[in-house]
Each structure stands twice: as C-alpha cells, then as structure tokens.
Swiss-Prot record:
The gene is NEURL4. It is found in: Cytoplasm, Cytoskeleton, Microtubule organizing center, Centrosome, Centriole. The lineage of its organism: Eukaryota, Metazoa, Chordata, Craniata, Vertebrata. Signal peptide: none annotated. This is Neuralized-like protein 4. Residues 41-207, 317-484, 520-686, 716-884, 913-1086, 1131-1294 form the NHR domain. CDD domains: SPRY_NHR_like (cd12887). It comes from Homo sapiens.
C-alpha cells in the first residue's frame, strides 16, 4: 500500500511498525503519515468471514447478501494494534432489515490461522468485543451499560478501539473516548470488526493516537476547558476518579475536527442519571462521558447565539411542557400525560416537551393505557413551534407548518402524507407497555424507534430546533416519558439473547485485573469419557446426554483451600434418566486418575453427596442427609467446602446442609459427577452461601432442613439508599424506620438494594409500631429499579409492574386482584416476621413467622428482575432484615403447587342436590329438574353452569351418561367468576354472549381443565395435569372443588388430582363444557347443609364453647351427649411397620427415635372409632433440634405403607397437625389451630378423637381444642411422627371421661372460673393461643371486624381466647346452648344473647367478681355506637351523671317512657341519678327503639351492613324495679317473660357491672 495515502502527506513507511517519513501536508507537523501512515493497522486482513468482500486496497469491507444474511461479516486488522493507536472504521452503509449493528473489539487470535465464527461474539481464546452497549469477553458479558449503544450509530458515524500501554481496551465513538471497556489485555491483539445485522459496509480510517494517559505518571495540568467544550469523567479501574480537561489546542485529534460538538451522545445524559451511575458500584471500570455545559445545537455560547436565544442547560430533565391540550392532565412530575374523559372525547390530547431536543437525544414514551372505543391511536413527532406561544390544535395533523409526525405506519409533514409505508409497525396496533421513541441525528435525519428498534430515516432534513410532541389521539389515553436505563427489559438488544452461547450470560462484574488466573477454580481437562470441558474450563457437559447416563465425572483443576467453597450451577438437564448430579471431594489428583464411570465406584479417598445421602469410598455413611439432589432443576446450585477442622459441608442453593463427614484430609480436589439427568454445569465464582454453623458438642451434627439456623446469615440483601422522603436507613442498610411517626403515616417506602433471585427469601421483622394510625405495613415486589422509581406516598399508588400485599388484599398495579389472602398484615404486631419470595415459576409467596402462606399471585414475568419493597405505613414504624433472608430450597418454595394425587374424597354430606343453571349453551337440553344435561346436536355450544357459587371445599360432581364416539376432544370443566344470570335468558338460549366452547369464555376470569391441560382465560398454564379427561367413559365421575386455600382441584372417580390452579376468586361457579364425545351428564353431588363458607364452628367442648363467665352451672351444658368417650381397648399399641429410626419397647406401647431427626413415623394398630380418644405422652425431647412431633391420621392401610422420611411428605390420604397448622396431603389448609405442638414440653399428653360426624378433634392434656379436620374418611389410623426434638412417646390409656376435660373426683370441687373457656392455667406453657380460624364462623368474624372499627382500647377487653363468643344459629346449636338460664339470689331467669356476638370485658379487680357472678342477676341494656366509649370509660351505666345510656331519651331519639327535663335544666347529679333501663331479654333491650342501628361497610367484603350494640351487665338484686315495657313495640318481644317484668329500671349508683359488649350485624 502507498504510505501517506488518503491525503496524509507522509511518505515512506511500509506496512511494518516502523515510523514513516515526512509530516503533514506541508512536510511538517504530526500528520497521520508520520508514524507509518496506514501501515500500522490501516488495512484489513485478507482472511475474512465467508460473506465479506474487500475493496479499496483492503480498507473497505462489505457484507454480501445483506437482505438475506445478517452475520458471517467478521473482519480483522492486518497487523496487531500498536499501543496508544486508535483503529477506527466509518460506517458506510446500513439496512433496516435486521436488529443489532456493528460490533468491534480486539482478539489475541492470529487471523492467518483463525477459523472464523459466524459473529464476533463467537470468538474465544482471548477476545473482547463491544456489542450494543455491552462488553463481552469470549462471548460472555462482563460489563453492561457501557459507553454509547453501537446499535444507535448511523451511516457516517465512526467507531474505533485502542489498546493502551497499560493493557486496557478503550472504545472511541466519533472521536469521543468512552472509557475503559476491559483490562488485562495481552500485548499482541488484532482489531476485530463484525459487520453484523444492520451494518453492511465499513471503511478503515487512518489510525490516530489515543488520548488516555499512557502511564499512571501524573500529567501536567492542562489549560481550562472552553465554555463550549465537554468534560470527560473517566472512572479508572482501581485509581481514583479523574476529570481530564481537554483543550482544543492540545489534545483534540486533528483528523476528527469539531467531533466534540457534532457527535456527542453522552451529552444527553441527565444530571440525575450521572449521579446515579456515579454512586452505583455495579459497573466499576466503566467510563461516563458527561456533558453538563453545552447547549443544544444552534444555541451555543457563541457571540451571537448567546445574545439571541435563551440557553437551556443540558441537565434540564426532558419532561412534558405544562402547557398542553385542553383535555390533558399531567402527573408524575410532568413525566406522565393522560387524556381526560377518554370514552367521551378522542382528541385535544396534544402534549409537547418542555425544551427542544438535542442532537442524538432519545425522546421515548411508554404507552400506559388504551381504550377500545375509537379508531386511530397515538401519534408522535417533532415540531418547530414553541409550546409557550402555540395555540394547541385538536390534533397535531391540523398544523400546517413546522411539524413532522408519525401516524399509523406513515409519516406526515405539515399535515400531509410524505411516506405511506415508513415501517412495518403501525402505531395503531401497539399495546399497553410498548415503547415509542424518536431522535434527531446530528446530520439532521429524524429516526423513529419502536420498542427500541430503529425504523430508519423518516426524513433526512429536520430543522435544528425542534420539540418532541405526542398526540394522545383515539385509543391512546396515557403515556409516560422513559429513559434509556428504564427499558433493559424491552427489545433493545434483541440479537444478544439469540446469539448467547454461554450460560454465563447474566449480568456480572468484570473480574479484577489483579486476580491471578491460575488461582481460579476450573475444571481439569482430564474428564470422563462422555464429558467435555468448555468455556475455558468453567463449564462441564455431557454432549450426548440422552445417549448415556454416566461417564460424566469432572474434577477441579487444583486442590481446594480450607474454607474455599466450590459451587456449580446446573445449566441443563434431560428427563430421560433417573438420578442427577453428585458432588464431593477426592484425594486423587485428576492428572493421574483413571476416571471411573461414576465416582461412587471409587473405593478410596472419596466423599460424595448422592441423592440425599453421603457416601465414603462407595459406602453410605449418612442415609438421610439434607436436600435430595435428584429433585434439583436447571438453575439450582450445589457446592462443597472443607473446613479447617476437617469437616465436610455441602450446600444446596446456598443453604448449608450441615456437616457430612469428619477428618477429611487437606488438599482434596472437588469432584462433580454429571450423572443421569444432569447434562451441564458451570462453576459459580461469586459464591453467596449461608455461614457454616459451628459443630455441636456431641451427637449427630446434622442440621434439619427445617431448622431456622440453616438459613442464617450471609445474604448481601440490604435496603437501598434511595427511599421515601420520611424513611431513614440505618444499621448498615439492614434497618428502616419512619421518622416523625406520630405526625407522618406514609412516604416511607424502602426497597431492596438488588433484585431478588428466584427462590430467594427477603424477610423482615417488625420492631416498632404505634397505635395512632389505622392500617399497617405493606410488602411486595416491584420490577421498577430503585433508580427509576419516583417514590409515591404509598406503593399501592404505583400502576405498573408492582405486586403488593395490603392487609389481606393482593394488589397488582394498584388494583385489588384477590381478597382474603391467608394472612393479614394489619393484624401483625411487634416481633412478627414477614418474608417475600418469587419462585422459579413466577409465583409470589409470603411467609409469616417462617410459615409459607401459599401462592399470593402468579404470572410474575420470569425474565424480569423484581425488587423487594416495604411500605412503612400507618402503625408500622421500624423493620429490620432478618438472618433468614437468603436463598431457599426451590422444591420447598413451590410445594404449594405440587400436583401429587391425594386420597379419594367423599362427596359432601347429604343435603340439597346441585342443579344446573337455566342459562346454558344453545345445544343443551336440561332434564330431570336441572340435574341432567344433554347436548342435543353438534359437538359444541354445550356450556352448563352450577346454579349457585361454590363454597369453600364444596365439590360439584357429575357422572358421564352418554358418549358420541364420532367426535374427538374431551369434556371440559372448571370454575368461572361469570355469574350465569349475566348471560341473558337460559333454557338453551345461550344468552347473548355465551361462546360455543369453554376456552372462548373470556369475559370474566375462568379456570378450566381440558384433556390434561390447565388453562386460564384460554391461555395454557400447565400440561400433563392429572388423568386425561379424553379417557372418560360412561359411568365415569368427574368433579371440581374450590379449596379453602383458593385452589381448584379436579376429581376423577372420586380421586383428587391435586391443585390445578391457585389464586381462585371467592365467588366462582362451576362450569362444564359438554364438548366432543361427552354428550350427556348428570349431577351426583349435593350442597352442604351446615356452615362451610368460613370455617367450622366450635366443637361442644371448644375453648369458646361455654357461658363460663356468667354461669356457675355451666357443667351441665356442652359436656355430655356426644362428648361421651368410648371404651378404650386394652390392645392399643404401635404397629411393627414404622420409620427406620424407630425402636419399639414396652409391649410396642413406647416408640423411641434412635438416630437423626427424621424417619420416626409410627402408627397405632387400631383404627379410630367415633368418640374414642387415643392419647400419647411426650416422654423425651432433644433440644438439639428444632420443630417437634407431628400428629394426624391416615386412611390408607398402614401395614403396607412405605413410610417417607417425615410425615409431611405423605401425599395421599393424610391429615396432619404440625406446629399450629393443619395439613392435608402436604398442603396447609389451616393455620393458628390450637397450641403450638413444637413448644409442648415433656409430659404433655396429646390425643386425637373422631366425633360422631367424622370431625377430627385435638386434645391437649385432656382439653378439647376443637375440630381440626371435618369429615375425615373412615377407617383411619392415628399417626405420630417423632420429628426434630421429640424422641420418645408412649401410648396413654386415659380414664373414662378424660376427654371432657374432667378428672375423676376433682371436677365437682372445681369452680367454673377455674375452667373458663376450656383451658386451665396449668396446661398453658406459653401465651394463650389466638382464636383459631377453625373455631370461628363467618358471622363471628364479621362482628369482630365491626368491633374493630369502633377503635376501642384493647385493655377494656379480655385477652384471647376468652375475648369473644358467638351466639349465631350454627354456633349455639353446636354447643347445645339453652335459650334461658337462671342466676343470682334469688334466682332470676335471663335469655342468652342468641343472634349476637359477645365480647367479654375485664372486671374491675377491686370488685369481688366471683361473688357478683353468682349472686347478682344478669340483664341487658340497649345502646348506640356513639355511647360505647363513654360507657366503657365510666365503667358502669348511669354513674350519677347525665348518661346518654339512661332511659331518658337523647335529642332526636324516640321517647322511652320518661319525661325529658327542660332544655336548660341540668339533671340532678347525686340526689336523683337518671334511671337506667335494663331487661333480662335481649330481644327487648335490642329492639331498634332502644338500640339504634348504624350502617357500616365491611372492610373485607366491601358490603354494607347494619349493626347494633348492647351491654350485658350484672345488676344487684333489689336495686331495680321490674315493670312493663315502656317502649312502643308492635308485638311482645319475648313471650318467655311476663310483660309485667320485661323492663327493669334502676336509679342506684353502682348497681350495675359491665360484663360484655354485644354486637349484632344484619
């Protein structure tokens, strides 16, 4: 080549690296030819990608067939790069057919011997490539958001790479240094350019010197930066930040004239972005080039410009202008625009930017809301009109000057079409969430972007000063301005995912240059016959995993250091084989080891974890150790570490599994066996594992998987430094609090410092609360990055990408999507722990005090990062992150959606038969009073519905009666929120909107099962669920059940197929589609007669079951009848079939667990019979473990049962009591039932009993805790799991009558007050348990919610469980309460408060409460809501002052038979207290004239109810005067009482004592 070509002026200088001759054009200076001209990297190597052709003496490269091919365009420099010289290319030509564009970098591979891959990202062996705005090393991303996005460069733009003398890689764009992209480059590298995607032709420009300092020696001070120049903020890898001030006379490259002004994309960064990127440490080593001073083009600081045009500083945020269309409403700090009345008006929705757009600045918006009413949609473009002086038109297309708009898929200039088919996308077809952007290039070309994809040049000539403009027209209602760092989730780097060849494509930090490469843990090249090592020793795989299941052994390249964790991530699995990955250590050097087919065949120096056991030299030493590796999935991690004390520990998903072996010698190599399903694994560098617990002093040192200690500690999750205005972050980011908590109740949102990983728990503990406000903490997750979140008052104000739990409501994007979730955050107090976790399936789970509450919602986007977010709202003031925060077991995290089959469920008890609704498909005929449905014609239009909503645990079941074999398909059934009556007239009419088939029923949310597929609103959710419904025959039964845990279950021939879907709404109807071969069905199920919507009412001897506070004769009620105990057989013993760690003794009546913490299941030989109490005593507890015994029943034959490691793993026919929860087939169906079994001390006697209706009762020390499980199938056997702390139990034969809570000879001498509510003090080893959900009905809960709305101090009421008692029809009948009782001396009758709910009040301790309850009479006093607090504060009725509760009426209230004093007369205080009206009948005292009604809205159901309040009081005999009723009543309120004694009046002070507040709700 000719030296000095291209006008360099130089001469001489061949292609070698030597200096050239001459100087610039005049023979002097420092022109390009002075250092060799083009001889140093100025040419491209003749060997190229297969589609590249070279021209212009090897300086121009063109990719052939650009319309058909997007890759194979790789070119390299002819010579290695010289340090400090920039290899620069110019983009000559681009096409719009593809996504992605030019990629550039360096490689250590010699092009003369290189086997060219299809793209630059396929280069390995020391290659660094900048792709888009990512830096990749050997195809793996090491730095994101670097420099300028190369995909946005246009024709004529220049890009170059430089290797500095310090071994750094720098990128140059249009003469601008983008900073350090990589460090540690080898001394000999070639430039590499990939003509990828849109880029089809480039030309090499003469090489130029770089601007980076060649050595770390301090540079002399440069002259100050001119006002119109930019400052480049260089963030070096390990040195301090330095700002290099570039002077045009000293450092600007001569061949890039005016480049700092004409091509400055980095000047577009807002100040907030600069600050955010500076403080973030995620991308150390990146370089930010920020222009904080230069104004937009055409508005510089020149002599004339400064005087004629206002200067807009570049750090002005790009927002919407305050002046806008007449229907526009701005919000979100003028970043969001919304058109008012979108269903009435379709125009007058024009908004403009607050300032002109700069060159190359992206103006991008996100569509937030659309409506379907209009045609046409959003329009976007630019205009030269200043918004301050513009009279806004109805639509921007009405402007006839200075306006360029994109409308549909065309371009309009001044209201007239100039390009009809500008791009493939039409703005009218975009959906909510899509992005639209535009930019004016420095060459005056206007480009539009849709979801990050450049649509090409819309117009080549755009005025220099233009404003962005958006027209919210037609369907478009709401948009928000977004910035570049907001949309990493959209299609900005479309090609990067498709071409990712490495499993390490996730976001990672660049490795420190100082890290020694040989020190990294790699796989040794000597591996199994069927294994291969790739990615520089980081990844091991079995290339033909489906052909063979073994010979996949790989070892580490060096020995492990003490305490060094070797951890791998499973990248790929196959489902052909059994077994999976195995991991361990060996003393054998991999260089000399002849590798076996599996490592368990090695008989020396080897420790391996396989399945859930540990093997040493091929022999099992621990059988049940930790999590089962065979259950792991792709993405899970396993690890191993040898501690200094010689103990070996394994890790699963970062969780330690405890010590597995002892006395392991030092210098062992890590070993991984890619066995069975495991096909590929990659070494994980940045290991984050929980700290290994210290060894216990003696005994088996395994750590139970359920132990809280196993989750302790080493998570890096903290609260982010960005938060709400009232929040304060302390304690190193682990504690968040709301200051001014008594004057501020919101603006205290805190968010996690990084995104949560799948299966990772983020748990906090409430540390401080105040009782000033209503409402409390709210918690959830958001996909909004903390840097992009403009913190609102509360997180429920966010209307996108946010999922929150508020109280019991699950809210998505500010809208309630589910009520009555399993926990209530408003009910939590100080010390409660709240956890959040997103599973790999995209489900969001909450944990309360470590207990999984089940899936709150599903469908969280799996590819989108989510951050934990906590709103310190209302009462909650301070929280801290707990040590339980961190990764959890994936299989445990998704256990609530397991699909294991459970035992066949019986149909509901006999009652009213189900019916089909009269609204049905047009081909359906209903017969036999709506219990039979037949499809009369065709194969579709066969929808039928249940007549009523399904209640919790209610089964709707049909039997197949007719088949038509000529059709294919299957019966479809499920649940829908669509009320059948909404579909119009029935009887086959089909209604106006009833679709022909169930998958098309999408007007309301519908869950359905077809064949073996689960769908929601027609969208596939699961495959391979249960039995295939296509195989149903005549006589087959199929049903659907809505579980109490908001799950949908399908039953086939009585067998539960497990949960098909979660998050089912409360109000759902059963729906069937008589589709295809199934032609006729008949109903075989019936609805329940008893209360089942809430939970079962209390049992006869429940702890809330008696009138104990006020009745000393309570022994007579609720203790006999069905509570009698059957005769205890003398042959009760444990079966010989039991867990492997059990040893039986004492005639098989004592069971002892002799090893480990599990494998301790025992079953009693005799099945349970009604009224037979079977009891066991806890003999011995080992405090080394956590958790304790599990109690329950199984209905399968125990003699042939193969017991699992723990009872909770029983997935068929099992009902278990564990802790305070009730479980069915491994799924929690109830919580907070009875006392916590994990805290029972030694000597506690626990019992199980079946009542006459099949309800399973739990007894603790002889006290019945109520019905745990209703309708247990029989026969069933009692089961005990000696788990965790419980190591020995013995069967106890109680004396007859023990079940009733009495012991022989003592009950008669015991005061009723000693047995109040069924639990004696001697049996309570902890705080009294809260009222169990199983022991309260819906009416009770409704009254309790109303009582809470009164905001009465809790100190007035008795603590649980003595707090309240329900007297609704169901509860009082189940207890057997009599309607009337007698009390006092002399005895007087009074009525029980049937239909009301009683809230017991504390008795004044100065009074002799025991005497009062026996000798005083019982009566009622009607009141109103406004008076309740004053009565409680006073402590009695009519305490000598004017009382609004006296029978003297209030103003505006009806008279009650007494004269009202004059208006200005003060009532007498001591001499004549106002009389108080009482009655022994609440029917009279609770009449509306005496107890006024008030309306309220139930916070749970949002329905309006009417409520009344009254007081139950003790009244001193002789202090009152009985008389006839004074209130005007239409009929006798209570015929049981004589009208002459229905009303009691007292005037004596101290004659009444408040006993209870009564509430009645209609």
């Amino acid at each position: 080549m000719a030296a000095g070509s291209g006008g360099s002026g130089g001469s001489g200088g061949g292609p070698g690296p030597g200096p050239g001759g001459g100087g610039g054009p005049s023979g002097s200076g420092s022109g390009p030819g002075s250092n060799g001209g083009l001889g140093s990297g100025g040419e491209l190597h003749p060997r190229t990608g297969r589609l590249v052709s070279l021209s212009a003496c090897g300086r121009t490269a063109r990719r052939q067939q650009p319309g058909q091919e997007f890759n194979h365009g790789l070119v390299l420099s002819r010579e290695p790069l010289r340090d400090g010289r920039v290899f620069t290319v110019r983009i000559d030509r681009k096409v719009n057919s593809w996504s992605g564009s030019i990629e550039i970098g360096v490689t250590a591979l010699d092009p003369s011997v290189l086997d060219f891959p299809s793209s630059a990202t396929g280069l390995k062996g020391g290659s660094w490539v900048v792709s888009g705005c990512s830096v990749l090393r050997d195809g793996r991303s090491v730095l994101e958001e670097y420099g300028q996005d190369l995909d946005q460069l246009g024709e004529g733009d220049r890009v170059g790479v430089e290797r500095t003398v310090a071994g750094e890689l720098r990128l140059w764009v249009n003469g601008r240094d983008c900073g350090v992209a990589a460090t540690g480059l080898p001394p000999r590298v070639w430039a590499v350019v990939d003509l990828y995607g849109k880029c089809t032709q480039i030309t090499v420009l003469p090489p130029e010197p770089g601007f980076s300092p060649p050595t770390p020696i301090p540079t002399p001070p440069l002259e100050p930066l001119a006002p119109t120049e930019d400052s480049a903020l260089a963030e070096q890898g390990t040195s301090a930040d330095e700002a290099f001030m570039v002077s045009p006379a000293q450092a600007r490259p001569e061949t890039f004239p005016n480049s700092l002004e004409s091509h400055n994309d980095f000047a577009n960064m807002e100040l907030s972005e600069v600050v955010s990127n500076t403080i973030l440490s995620a991308y150390n080593g990146g370089l930010l080039n920020v222009n904080l001073s230069s104004p937009p083009a055409g508005e510089g600081l020149g002599s004339s410009g400064a005087a004629t045009s206002p200067i807009l500083t570049s750090n002005d945020a790009l927002l919407f202008h305050e002046k806008c269309g007449t229907l526009i409403k701005l919000s979100n700090n003028n970043k969001t625009a919304e058109r008012r009345r979108p269903l009435d008006e379709f125009n007058n929705g024009v908004v403009m930017t607050n300032r002109p757009l700069r060159d190359n600045e992206m103006f991008e918006i996100r569509i937030d809301k659309l409506v379907d009413k209009w045609s046409g949609s959003i329009e976007i473009g630019v205009t030269t009109h200043n918004p301050n002086s513009l009279e806004y038109p109805a639509t921007m297309t009405n402007l006839q000057s200075g306006t360029i708009m994109m409308s549909g898929c065309g371009i309009l200039t001044n209201g007239k079409g100039t390009r009809r088919e500008y791009c493939e996308f039409s703005l009218d077809e975009l959906q909510e969430g899509d992005h639209i952007g535009l930019t004016r290039k420095s060459n005056s070309a206007l480009h539009f972007f849709i979801n990050g994809i450049d649509q090409g040049v819309a117009t080549p000539l755009t005025p220099p000063v233009v404003y962005g403009v958006v027209d919210l027209y037609g369907m478009a209602v709401k948009v928000t301005i977004v910035h570049n760092n907001n949309h990493s989730d959209r299609l900005r780097r479309n090609n990067a995912i498709l071409r990712a060849l490495s499993p390490e494509g996730a976001l990672r930090r660049a490795a420190p240059a100082a890290q020694a490469e040989p020190e990294r843990l790699l796989f040794h090249p000597n591996c199994g016959q069927k294994a291969a090592i790739t990615h520089e020793g980081r990844t091991a795989l079995r290339p033909h995993a489906t052909d063979d299941f073994n010979h996949g052994v790989v070892l580490s390249s060096r020995a492990l250091r003490d305490g060094e964790v070797f951890q791998v991530r499973i990248d790929k699995m196959v489902d052909k084989w059994a077994g999976s990955i195995e991991i361990g250590v060996t003393t054998h050097n991999p260089a000399y080891l002849q590798l076996p087919s599996t490592m368990t065949n090695l008989r020396s120096g080897t420790w391996m974890m396989t399945g859930n056991g540990v093997m040493h030299n091929g022999t099992t030493i621990l059988d049940e150790y930790g999590h089962n590796l065979d259950r792991l999935k792709a993405g899970d991690t396993v690890g191993v570490v040898r501690r200094e004390d010689g103990t070996l520990h394994f890790f699963v998903n970062g969780m330690t599994q405890g010590p597995a072996a002892w006395n392991v010698p030092p210098g062992v190599y890590a070993v991984v066996d890619l066995y069975g399903q495991a096909a590929q694994a990659t070494i994980v560098d940045d290991v984050e594992v929980a700290p290994v617990p210290e060894p216990l002093p003696e005994g088996n040192n395994q750590v139970s998987p359920s132990s809280p200690s196993s989750g302790a500690g080493g998570s890096d999750l903290r609260f982010h430094q960005l938060h709400g205005s009232n929040a304060v972050i302390t304690n190193g980011g682990r504690t968040a609090l709301r200051h001014n908590c008594r004057s501020e109740f919101n603006d205290a949102i805190v968010i996690s410092n990084r995104a949560l990983r799948d299966g990772e728990l983020f748990e906090i503990v409430i540390q401080k609360m105040v009782d000033r406000w209503s409402g409390s903490i709210e918690a959830g997750v958001t996909a909004i990055r903390p840097e992009d979140l403009e913190f609102p008052n509360t997180m429920t104000d966010i209307d996108y990408d946010t999922w929150m739990l508020s109280g019991t409501a699950i809210m998505q994007d500010g809208n309630t999507m589910r009520n009555n979730y399993g926990c209530d955050l408003d009910a939590l107090g100080t010390g409660a722990r709240i956890g959040m976790m997103r599973t790999a399936k995209g489900d969001l789970h909450y944990f309360i005090n470590g207990q999984d509450q089940g899936a709150a919602c599903s469908g969280l986007p799996p590819g989108k990062e989510v951050y934990a977010v906590v709103d310190l709202y209302g009462q909650c003031v301070q929280v801290s992150i707990t040590n339980a925060t961190g990764p959890m077991d994936n299989s445990l995290a998704t256990s609530n959606t397991a699909t294991e089959k459970s035992f066949p469920l019986h149909s509901p008890v006999a009652g009213v038969a189900h019916r089909f609704h009269s609204t049905c498909g047009k081909n359906v005929t209903l017969e036999e009073d709506g219990t039979r449905a037949v499809r009369a014609a065709g194969y579709a239009h066969g929808l039928v519905f249940s007549t009523k909503e399904l209640r919790a645990e209610e089964v709707f079941e049909v039997k197949v009666e007719e088949l038509d074999e000529k059709w294919a398909g299957s019966l479809r059934l499920g649940l829908t929120t669509l009320a059948p009556g909404e579909m119009g007239p029935g009887a086959g009419g089909g209604g106006p909107g009833l679709p022909p088939s169930l998958p098309e029923l999408r007007t309301k949310t519908t869950w359905m099962v077809s064949s073996c597929e689960v769908r929601r609103d027609g969208q596939l959710q699961r495959m391979n669920y249960g039995r295939n419904l296509e195989r149903l025959g005549v006589g087959s039964r199929v049903g659907v059940r809505r579980g109490a845990d908001d799950t949908m279950h399908i039953l086939v021939d009585g067998e539960d197929m497990g949960p098909a879907a979660t998050g089912i709404a409360k109000n759902v109807w059963a729906v069937l589609d008589l589709y295809g071969p199934v032609r006729g069905v008949s109903i075989v199920s019936s609805t329940r007669l008893e209360e089942s919507e809430g939970t079962q009412p209390p049992s006869p001897s429940s702890d809330t079951g008696s009138e104990g506070e006020e009745d000393d004769e309570g022994e007579e009620h609720g203790l006999g009848g069905q509570n009698e105990v059957g005769i205890i057989p003398t042959t009760l013993e444990f079966l010989e079939n039991h867990g492997k760690n059990i040893l039986l003794s004492n005639g098989n009546r004592t069971a002892t667990r002799v090893a480990s913490y599990n494998q301790g299941i025992v079953v009693i030989n005799q099945p349970l019979v009604p009224q037979l109490l079977v009891q066991v005593r806890i003999d011995f507890l080992n405090r080394q473990w956590t958790s304790s015994l599990v109690l329950g029943v199984i209905t399968c034959a125990p003699e042939r049962l193969n017991f699992p490691a723990s009872a909770c793993a029983l997935k068929r026919a099992a009902w278990l009591l564990r802790g305070r929860g009730v479980f069915h087939n491994g799924l929690k169906i109830c919580e907070k039932f009875g006392p916590n079994l994990d805290t029972c001390p030694e000597g506690t006697i626990l019992g199980l009993r079946l009542d006459s209706s099949g309800g399973l009762h739990l007894h603790v020390n002889g006290v019945d805790q109520g019905v745990a499980v209703p309708d247990v199938p029989q026969p069933c056997h009692a089961l005990v799991d000696l788990y965790g702390q419980c190591e020995q139990v013995t069967i106890v034969n109680p004396e007859p009558g023990a079940a009733s809570g009495k012991s022989a000879g003592t009950q008669g001498d015991m005061e009723k007050a000693d047995m109040v509510d069924g639990i004696k003090e001697s049996v309570c080893w902890g705080p009294p348990p809260a009222a169990s959900p199983l022991k309260s009905c819906e009416y009770h809960a409704l009254c309790s919610r109303f009582q809470e709305l009164l905001l009465l101090p809790e100190d007035y009421f008795m603590p649980p469980p003595k707090r309240s008692l329900c007297y609704c029809e169901s509860c009082r009948k189940l207890r057997g309460d009599e309607a009337h009782r007698r009390r006092g001396e002399p005895p007087r009758e009074y009525a029980l408060p049937f239909g009301w709910c009683r809230f017991n009040l504390r008795v004044n301790p100065r009074l002799e409460a025991g005497t009062l309850t026996k000798k005083w009479h019982m009566a009622y006093h009607g009141s109103n809501v406004a008076a309740v607090r004053r009565v409680l504060d006073r402590g009695e009725l009519g305490a000598g002052t004017a009382s609004i509760l006296s029978c003297r009426p209030l103003k505006g209230e009806p008279g009650v038979g007494f004269e009202e004093p004059g208006e200005n007369c003060a009532p007498p205080r001591e001499e004549q207290p106002p009389p108080v009206l009482l009655s022994p009948s609440l029917q009279y005292a609770g009449a509306e004239t005496l107890a006024s009604k008030v309306q309220f809205r139930d916070p749970k159901s949002q329905r309006t109810h009417q409520a009344q309040v009254a007081f139950q009081v003790c009244v001193r005999p002789g202090s009152y005067t009985p008389g006839p009723p004074s209130a005007a009543l239409g009929e006798p309120p209570d015929p049981h009482f004589s009208p002459a004694e229905l009303e009691w009046v007292t005037k004596e002070k101290g004659a009444t004592l408040l006993c209870a507040l009564l509430v009645r709700v209609e």
